[in-house]
Amino acid sequence: MVSRKRNSVIYRFASLLLVLMLSACSALQGTPQPAPPVTDHPQEIRRDQTQGLQRIGSVSTMVRGSPDDALAEIKAKAVAAKADYYVVVMVDETIVTGQWYSQAILYRK
């Protein structure tokens, strides 16, 4: 009797957990948004703002300093490539303390 009751509780808890996890997944999917108007310098955008833009390549950097230094280097490379927008894919510290690796995808209108 106790085992059957415990199985029922576990089954209900597992069902509730599954429903909560599935609803959380839908919260992560963003609906496409338009990119901001083009300016004279590249702008960082989110992944859901890339619809309708032309991908022109990707860039990566490895710098000593801080994450802000890595992002500044990404922006400088986007300027050199004459990109209108860029999406930062990752900024991560390497095994070496103070050395940062970053990647971004470049887009044009």
UniProtKB/Swiss-Prot annotation:
Q: What drives induction of this protein's expression?
A: Up-regulated in biofilms.
Q: Which UniProt keywords apply?
A: Cell membrane, Lipoprotein, Membrane, Palmitate, Signal, Stress response
- Pfam families per the UniProt record, alphabetical: YdgH_BhsA-like
Q: Per UniProt, what is the membrane topology? A: Lipid-anchor
Q: Which gene encodes it?
A: bsmA
Covalently lipidated residues, kind N-palmitoyl cysteine: C25
GO terms for biological process, alphabetical: DNA damage response; response to stress; single-species biofilm formation
Give the primary localization class.
membrane
Q: Where in the cell is it found?
A: Cell membrane
Give the residues carrying a lipid (S-diacylglycerol cysteine): C25
Its signal peptide is 1-24
Job description of the protein = Involved in protection of biofilms against oxidative stress.
Give the CC-aspect GO terms: plasma membrane
**Disruption phenotype annotation:** Mutant exhibits reduced microcolony formation and greatly enhanced flagellar motility. Biofilms from the mutant strain are less able to resist acid and peroxide stresses.
* Family the UniProt entry places it in: Belongs to the BhsA/McbA family.
Q: What is this protein called?
A: Lipoprotein BsmA
Domain of life, per UniProt, equals Bacteria
Q: Which NCBIfam families match?
A: PRK14864.1
